UniProtKB/Swiss-Prot annotation:
GO terms for cellular component: plasma membrane. One of its GO terms (biological process) is galactitol metabolic process. Belongs to the GatZ/KbaZ family. GatZ subfamily. Pathway: Carbohydrate metabolism; D-tagatose 6-phosphate degradation; D-glyceraldehyde 3-phosphate and glycerone phosphate from D-tagatose 6-phosphate: step 2/2. Pfam families: GatZ_KbaZ-like. Induction: Constitutively expressed. Forms a complex with GatY. HAMAP family: Tagatose_aldol_GatZ. Component of the tagatose-1,6-bisphosphate aldolase GatYZ that is required for full activity and stability of the Y subunit. Could have a chaperone-like function for the proper and stable folding of GatY. When expressed alone, GatZ does not show any aldolase activity. Is involved in the catabolism of galactitol. This is D-tagatose-1,6-bisphosphate aldolase subunit GatZ. Keywords: Galactitol metabolism.
Length: 420
C-alpha cells in the first residue's frame, strides 16, 4: 500500500479498488481478474464480518486469511500480491456495551487482525458506546483510535511494521449503503478533515506513537457519493475540489467508502482528486446476484420441472422466514419487500448466500446447467454483455465463467478509474 500511495503522491494517476466481500465467488473474481497483471489486489474484511469471535461469517481474521489464500492458490494468484485489510476496526460490534468493555474487545480485535497478517488497518472508533454522548467528541474518537493503534503496534513484528498502514477518519457512511432513501449527501468540509488529522496526530503523539503516524496513509471522508435501495448519488468533482486541494499538502490520500454503482468516469475523477482508495462491496455481490438470477431464468426454460433447483423461490422463502438481515432496512408490505429483496442496490441478499438451503439450490442449478449447451439467444436475452464477449471469442458460455465475467464488469470500471 505504501508504495502505491507514494506513486500517487508523486503525481501518477494510480489508485486501488478495495474489495469488501467475503463471498468466495467475488474473491475468486477479484483475484482471477488481475491474475495476469502486475497489480496487487486489496481484499478487506469488516469487523462485524470477521472478528475474534467469528463475526457473522464465523471466521476469525486468521480463518479469513486462509480462506482468501486457499482461493488464491486455486486461481493461481500469488499470495504475496494480496493486501489484506481490516475495515471499521473498533467498537462497531459492541456499541451496546460501555466504552471500557467495548474498547477492551476492540483492542483484541485489532491485535487479532495484525497477528493474522492484515497490513491495512482502518482505525474506526467513531461510534458511541453505551453511556457515551452522541456524537462523540473528535478528541475522544482520536484518543480511542490511538489506543487501537497502540494495540496494533504492540503485536506487529519488525517485518510487519514495514508493511503496516493505517487509515483514520470518522465520516464513514453506513456500511453497505444507507438504510433509508437519500436525496443528497453532506460532503466533508476541509476544516473537519483537518481537525480529524490534527486530533489524531495529537492523540498518537500523547501515546508515544509518533513513528506510527508515519504509517497513516489515508483519511476517510465523504466526497459526495452514496447509494440507497434505488438511488445513487453520483460524484460531482467540482463539489469536492476544496478537499482535493487540501490533501495535496499532506503525505496522505483519501479513502472513499460506498463508491458502489458510480460510473467508470467518476472513478477516474475520484482517483484524480486523490480519493485513491475506492471501497466496493454491494455492487460486486449485486452483479453476482444478477448473474445467478439470469442463470435461474435460463434453467427455468431449459430444465424439466422435476429437476429444477427452484433457486429463486428458495431464496425468497429463506429471506422471508429469516428476515433479520433485511427487515430494518427494507420497505414493509409484501410486494415492496419482495422487490427490495430481489433488486435493492444495498443487496441485503448477500448475507444469505451461505445459508445451506440457498447454497444447495444454487449448486443444483449450476450442476443442471453445466452439462447443457445454453442457446446463444438466451444468453443475449439474460446476459447481453456476456453474449457480446462470447461472440468475440473472449468468453465461453459456461455458467461459472458467465458469473465471473458479470462480476468482472464491476471490476472493469474500477480498473479504468485506478489506471496503472
Amino acid at each position: 500500500m505504501k508504495t502505491l500511495i507514494a506513486r500517487h503522491k508523486a503525481g501518477e494517476h494510480i489508485g486501488i479498488c478495495s474489495v469488501c466481500s467475503a463471498h468466495p465467488l467475488v474473491i475468486e473474481a477479484a483475484l482471477a481478474f488481475d491474475r495476469n497483471s502486475t497489480r496487487k489486489v486489496l481484499i478487506e474484511a469488516t469487523s462485524n464480518q470477521v472478528n475474534q469471535f467469528g463475526g457473522y461469517t464465523g471466521m476469525t481474521p486468521a480463518d479469513f486469511r486462509e480462506f482468501v489464500f486457499t482461493i488464491a492458490d486455486k486461481v493461481g494468484f500469488a499470495r504475496e500480491r494480496i493486501i489484506l485489510g481490516g475495515d471499521h476496526l473498533g467498537p462497531n460490534c459492541w456499541q451496546q456495551e460501555n466504552a471500557d468493555a467495548a474498547m477492551e474487545k476492540s483492542v483484541e480485535l485489532v491485535k487479532a487482525y495484525v497477528r493474522a497478517g492484515f497490513s491495512k488497518i482502518h482505525l474506526d472508533a467513531s461510534m458511541s458506546c453505551a453511556g457515551d454522548p452522541i456524537p462523540l467528541a473528535p478528541e475522544t474518537v482520536a484518543e480511542r483510535a490511538a489506543v487501537l493503534c497502540f494495540a496494533a503496534e504492540s503485536v506487529a513484528t519488525d517485518c510487519q511494521r514495514e508493511q503496516l498502514s493505517y487509515v483514520i477518519g470518522t465520516e464513514v457512511p453506513v456500511p453497505g449503503g444507507e438504510a433509508s432513501a437519500i436525496q443528497s449527501v453532506h460532503i466533508t468540509r476541509v476544516e473537519d478533515a483537518a481537525n480529524t488529522l490534527r486530533t489524531h496526530q495529537k492523540a498518537f503523539i500523547a501515546r508515544g506513537l509518533a513513528e506510527a503516524l508515519t504509517r497513516v496513509i489515508a483519511i476517510v471522508v465523504q466526497p459526495g457519493v452514496e447509494f440507497d435501495h434505488s438511488n445513487i448519488i453520483h460524484y460531482q468533482p467540482q463539489e469536492a475540489q476544496p478537499l482535493a486541494q487540501w490533501i495535496e499538502n499532506t503525505r496522505m490520500v483519501y479513502e472513499a467508502h460506498s463508491t458502489d454503482y458510480q460510473t467508470r468516469t467518476a472513478y477516474w475523477e475520484l482517483v484524480r482528486d486523490h480519493f485513491a482508495i475506492l471501497k466496493v462491496g454491494p455492487a460486486l455481490t449485486f452483479a453476482l446476484r444478477e448473474a445467478i438470477f439470469a442463470l435461474a431464468q435460463i434453467e427455468q426454460e431449459l430444465i424439466a420441472p422435476e429437476n429444477r433447483s427452484g433457486c429463486l423461490a428458495v431464496i425468497e422463502e429463506v429471506m422471508f422466514d429469516e428476515p433479520q438481515y433485511w427487515k430494518k432496512y427494507y420497505r414493509t408490505g409484501f410486494n415492496d419487500s419482495l422487490l427490495d429483496i430481489r433488486y435493492s442496490l444495498s443487496d441485503r441478499i448477500r448475507y444469505y448466500w451461505p445459508h445451506s438451503r440457498i447454497k444447495n439450490s444454487v449448486e443444483t442449478m449450476m450442476v443442471n446447467l453445466e452439462g447443457m449447451e445454453i442457446p446463444l439467444g438466451m444468453i443475449s436475452q439474460y446476459l447481453p454483455k456476456q453474449f457480446e464477449r462470447i461472440q468475440s471469442g473472449e468468453l465461453s458460455a459456461i455458467p461459472h465463467q458467465l458469473i465471473m465475467d458479470k462480476i468482472y464488469d464491476v471490476l472493469r470500471a474500477y480498473r479504468y478509474g485506478c489506471a496503472e
